Amino acid sequence: PKTKDAEATFVKAMNERVKKLGCTGTLFENPHGLDFDEWAGDMHSTAHDVALMMQEAMKNDTIREVVASEDSWIEVTGADGTDHSHSMDTHNYLLGQDGNIGGKTGTTDDAGYCFTSAYNRDGDEIYTVVLNSTTTDQRFTDTATLANWYYGHKMTVAIANTQEKTANDNPLMARISQTDWTDKTIDATLADPTAQATVFSLAGEVTEKVSYDDLSGTVHVGDKVGSVTLKQDDTKIAVMDLVAD
């Protein structure tokens, strides 16, 4: 829609968008992020909010491609109609190192040296944010430290948290009743008895919940009889079928 003040309309949309992302400590006052001279004001954000924005941005394939580029050339047409080629080089000195797949730097006197980036190691993607670093090198050092700290606290746990075994020597997850049998139960194991889940060791206790299907009639080995769900602090980290064994 047409507007008399396109910039104000755009900034309003920016603030509305980040609120929908769950950002509670962010205020945009211009579209470019400068905060000095004629742009001085109350613009602000938090590391948490910037991480939410980075996470959302990385859902866009074009943005993922751009931040993963070391350098590129773009063609622009000036106001006089003349075409120009411009070289664009990345300021992300961590790109391609230890799983870093992209990032965005930013610097002002008030904000200091800032950097948000994305890492992906073995399919586990995270987003880091460093604000108000003292030097450009320090923001990258701090970023690498954050990423290594997180991945250093990842661990794998067995979904089958039991020492009991079925007759077939698989983990005994449950004994499930069958409505047609009053004196028998069905041994249940995991669809993949060796399955593991990856958790963050500092994120809280891992709990397990087993759900049972209503069973009747003939039940064969390998038939689904329920499911098991692993959670860590109410965050679902794994779900797997239980099968008759």
Residue ranges and their predicted role:
Residues P1-Q55:
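Mid-domain, small-residue-enriched loop/turn segments at the edges of structured enzyme/sensor domains
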Residues C23, G41-D245:
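Domain-terminus/edge residues, biased toward the C-terminal soluble/receptor-binding domains
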